[in-house]
Amino acid sequence: MKDLVAKRYVKALIDGRNSESINTISNKLNQVASAFADERFNSIISSPEISDKSKVDLIISFVDGTDNSLNNFIKLLGEKRRLDLLPFIAKDLNIQLAKMNNNYIGVVYTNQELSSDYISSIEKQFSKKFDVKLSLSQNVCDYDGIKVDIDGLGVEISFSKDRLKSQLIDHILKAV
């Protein structure tokens, strides 16, 4: 539910701005969103004993030196008691900024460490295939095969040993 509300705020932040100002706003909101990782900060923001104005002033102190539009945006969120949406707004704004810049981040899931040359070759091939700038990170887990997940593009490509075995067995049984 918070994601849906955050998307509307992100759309409002993006409308009528150039990519440079959107990038500046995104960086400032990422600073604020990182503060939400602290438990004490969350308790301050969610506390009913602390006034909304004090909460807004605290958050604005993180983003001092920006234009008035970001300050007014944070004040609006404070008036509507939606300051807890800031991490979701920052995340969605990063996704929209990546789409605008045609720059995406993906994850390669494997059960063993792959060399950086292999990861970069996968990056280059997928970048050429989808005509985007792509950076891949690796996640070593218990997945028996290899899976590439590019979230912003909605692409998930996987090769599983178990699936290959079952398809091979099915093919042999059909041939007999």
Curated annotation (Swiss-Prot):
It holds the Pfam family OSCP. Belongs to the ATPase delta chain family. F-type ATPases have 2 components, F(1) - the catalytic core - and F(0) - the membrane proton channel. F(1) has five subunits: alpha(3), beta(3), gamma(1), delta(1), epsilon(1). F(0) has three main subunits: a(1), b(2) and c(10-14). The alpha and beta chains form an alternating ring which encloses part of the gamma chain. F(1) is attached to F(0) by a central stalk formed by the gamma and epsilon chains, while a peripheral stalk is formed by the delta and b chains. One of its GO terms (cellular component) is proton-transporting ATP synthase complex. It is found in: Cell inner membrane. Keywords: ATP synthesis, Cell inner membrane, Cell membrane, CF(1), Hydrogen ion transport, Ion transport, Membrane, Transport. InterPro entries: ATP_synth_OSCP/delta_N_sf, ATPase_OSCP/dsu. It is a peripheral membrane protein. The keyword Cell membrane applies. HAMAP family: ATP_synth_delta_bact (MF_01416). One of its GO terms (molecular function) is proton-transporting ATP synthase activity, rotational mechanism. F(1)F(0) ATP synthase produces ATP from ADP in the presence of a proton or sodium gradient. F-type ATPases consist of two structural domains, F(1) containing the extramembraneous catalytic core and F(0) containing the membrane proton channel, linked together by a central stalk and a peripheral stalk. During catalysis, ATP synthesis in the catalytic domain of F(1) is coupled via a rotary mechanism of the central stalk subunits to proton translocation. Gene3D superfamilies: N-terminal domain of the delta subunit of the F1F0-ATP synthase. This is ATP synthase subunit delta.
